[in-house]
Amino acid sequence: MQKLLFIFTFIASVAFSAHAQEEFFSAPDFAQIERNIKEPTSSYYHPKLMEKYMAGDEKMTLEEGRHLYFGFIYQPQYMPVDTSAYNNKLAEVLSKKSFTPTDYTSILQYSDALLLEDPFNLRALNAKLLVYAQQNNAEEYKKVAQQRHVVQNAIAGTGDGMSADTPFYVIKVAHEYDILPFLGYNFGGEDKILSSKKVNYLTLADNRFGVERVYFNISPILDHLNARGGGKM
C-alpha cells in the first residue's frame, strides 16, 4: 500500500507542477531547434541530449528537454504513429488484477520494446515505474521517473491547452492521451482535428477544474505524414 501511495503522490505532484507552469509557456521554435540539435558543438546536440536522458540525468534543463523531445522529429527513427504490436501485449498484462513475477518481467520487456521505437512513450515509462516500485528498485525508479519528468515538462511548457491558440505541442498522438492524467484529467470520449490550425482537441470527463477540452498542436505529425504522401495517424 505504501508503494502505491508513493506512486499516486508522485503523479499528483507532477500534475500540480504542470498547472503551475500555465503562465510560463512558449511554443517550440522548430527551425531553431533543428539547427541546434544538428550542430555537434552545440549543448543541444541531439545525441548528447539523448545520452543524458537515457541516463536519467537530473541536471537536464527544461530547454534541453524541449530540444530533446521536439528535436526527435528530425531523427531518422521518428515515427509519428503507433505501429508496435507490443502496445496490445503491454495493455493485456496491465489489465490483470494482480501481477506475478513473470508478469513483471513481461511488462519490462514490452515497455523496453516500445521505448526503442518511441523513447518518450509515457505509457511504457509508467509501466516500468509500476514494476520498479513493487520491486523496491529505487535506483531504476528514480531514473525512469526523471525521464518521465523531462517528457511531461517538454509538453506542458509549450502552452496551456485551453484553446486552439495556446495548445500543448506533441510529436505523437498517443502522447496527447498519456499526458492527460498528469494534468489531472481523464479522456471524455471525443477526439477532433481542426485541420486549418493543425490542432487536435480531446474532450474531458468531469474534472475539478471545470475544463471541457484540451487542445494539442499536432503540426509535427501532420507535416511528417504529408511529406510522405499522407497516411493515418
Predicted features along the sequence, with ranges:
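Bacterial Sec-dependent N-terminal signal peptides
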Residues: 1-26
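N-terminal alpha-helical interaction modules that lie
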Residues: 21-104, 165-233
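Residue-level signature for tetratricopeptide repeat
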Residues: 96-97, 114, 131
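Alpha-helical solenoid repeat scaffolds, predominantly canonical TPR units
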Residues: 103, 110-111, 143-147
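Boundary/linker segments of alpha-helical solenoid repeat arrays
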Residues: 122-123, 150-164
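TPR/TPR-like (Sel1-like) alpha-helical repeat modules
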Residues: 133-156
